[in-house]
Swiss-Prot record:
<comment type="function">
    <text>Binds 23S rRNA and is also seen to make contacts with the A and possibly P site tRNAs.</text>
</comment>
<keyword id="KW-0699">rRNA-binding</keyword>
<keyword id="KW-0689">Ribosomal protein</keyword>
<feature type="region of interest" description="Disordered">
    <location>
        <begin position="1"/>
        <end position="25"/>
    </location>
</feature>
<dbReference type="InterPro" id="IPR020798">
    <property type="entry name" value="Ribosomal_uL16_CS"/>
</dbReference>
<dbReference type="GO" id="GO:0019843">
    <property type="term" value="F:rRNA binding"/>
</dbReference>
<protein>
    <recommendedName>
        <fullName>Large ribosomal subunit protein uL16</fullName>
    </recommendedName>
</protein>
<dbReference type="InterPro" id="IPR016180">
    <property type="entry name" value="Ribosomal_uL16_dom"/>
</dbReference>
<dbReference type="GO" id="GO:0022625">
    <property type="term" value="C:cytosolic large ribosomal subunit"/>
</dbReference>
<dbReference type="InterPro" id="IPR047873">
    <property type="entry name" value="Ribosomal_uL16"/>
</dbReference>
<dbReference type="GO" id="GO:0003735">
    <property type="term" value="F:structural constituent of ribosome"/>
</dbReference>
<keyword id="KW-0820">tRNA-binding</keyword>
<dbReference type="InterPro" id="IPR036920">
    <property type="entry name" value="Ribosomal_uL16_sf"/>
</dbReference>
<comment type="subunit">
    <text>Part of the 50S ribosomal subunit.</text>
</comment>
<dbReference type="GO" id="GO:0006412">
    <property type="term" value="P:translation"/>
</dbReference>
<keyword id="KW-0694">RNA-binding</keyword>
<dbReference type="Pfam" id="PF00252">
    <property type="entry name" value="Ribosomal_L16"/>
</dbReference>
Amino acid sequence: MLIPRRVKHRKQHHPSRSGAAKGGTQVTFGDYGIQALEPAYITNRQIESARIAMTRHIKRGGKIWINIFPDRPLTKKPAETRMGSGKGSPEWWIANVKPGRVLFEMTYPNEEIAREALRRAMHKLPCKCRIVTREEQF
C-alpha cells in the first residue's frame, strides 16, 4: 500500500476537485498511459488494485510507472455518532486527480497486450479514463 512515511499534520481540509490538471498530462516515461477524464479521489487501495491487474496481465517483459501518490488523508466519523465533537479520524489516503492527469504509464513490446492490461486497470479506478500513447496530446 502507498502511504506517506510521516506527515506534518494528521488531518487536512478536503482538496478541491474543480479545474484541470496543471502538470503530468503527457506520457513521459513509458509508451502507453491511462489518462483521467474526470476529477476523482483515488485511494491507495484502488491504486494498488490497478497495479496488480496490470502486472498480472503482462507477466514479464514490461515496466509500469505509477504517477500519482496518495498523500492526502480523508477523515470519517464513526456510524451513529452525534454531530459535533471534532473532526473524525483519518480513514483513507487519497490522491486528488484532476482531468488530464496521466495516472499510470507502461512500456511493453506488444501493443495489444499493453492496451488490454491498461483496460483492466481502468476498471479498478473510480473515474472515466482513456488510454493514451506517447504521440497523443490532451
